Amino acid sequence: MNKKLLMNFFIVSPLLLATTATDFTPVPLSSNQIIKTAKASTNDNIKDLLDWYSSGSDTFTNSEVLDNSLGSMRIKNTDGSISLIIFPSPYYSPAFTKGEKVDLNTKRTKKSQHTSEGTYIHFQISGVTNTEKLPTPIELPLKVKVHGKDSPLKYGPKFDKKQLAISTLDFEIRHQLTQIHGLYRSSDKTGGYWKITMNDGSTYQSDLSKKFEYNTEKPPINIDEIKTIEAEIN
């Protein structure tokens, strides 16, 4: 190899290597791009929360448990139809056995599915309880604050059931907050908490910035033993 060619090799080769390495090196996001991506993700999450909690729920009363297993339950309704209930957590199963009568608060997730056994309608669970009723309906003692200031209620959620699941209470409280107090409807009302205090001093609490975690579901509580329900939106 002559001197001129050798010199060109040593001069050009490092540049070629540098160019090749640059072609395969990912370009990091700028701080503005990272902020925009995080904001878009947050907005999608808030929209999902608003869609979920501002829409209505489905209620089944006096349904018969056909089978109950981890992650799902089949029930026979009073009109003879069969519904398949899908639990948000595959490890959750309420303590009811075949043949028992139950009330359910649910959210529809799929259209009807016709099978040889009957028509299945898929629902996502938001509470299973017994069918016991109260002599007179009870209004939940809900007190709401928005950014630290009282936000009065004309009326609170009212129930004639003796028991409610924590997940059902979560849905009903948040539904009220979205409809009356603007929860999830503006950028300054996307978080906070609700807290239930019972007469015996025990408490239940949920973070408003994310959906209720169904794997933390507790046994149903008697609503006539609720002392206070506080909700803070921020």
UniProtKB/Swiss-Prot annotation:
Its main location: secreted. GO terms for molecular function: toxin activity. The keyword Nucleus does not apply. Keywords: Secreted, Signal, Superantigen, Toxin, Virulence. One of its GO terms (cellular component) is extracellular region. Residues 1-40 form the signal peptide. It is found in: Secreted. Pfam families: Stap_Strp_tox_C. Responsible for the symptoms of toxic shock syndrome. Belongs to the staphylococcal/streptococcal toxin family. This is Toxic shock syndrome toxin-1. The gene is tst.
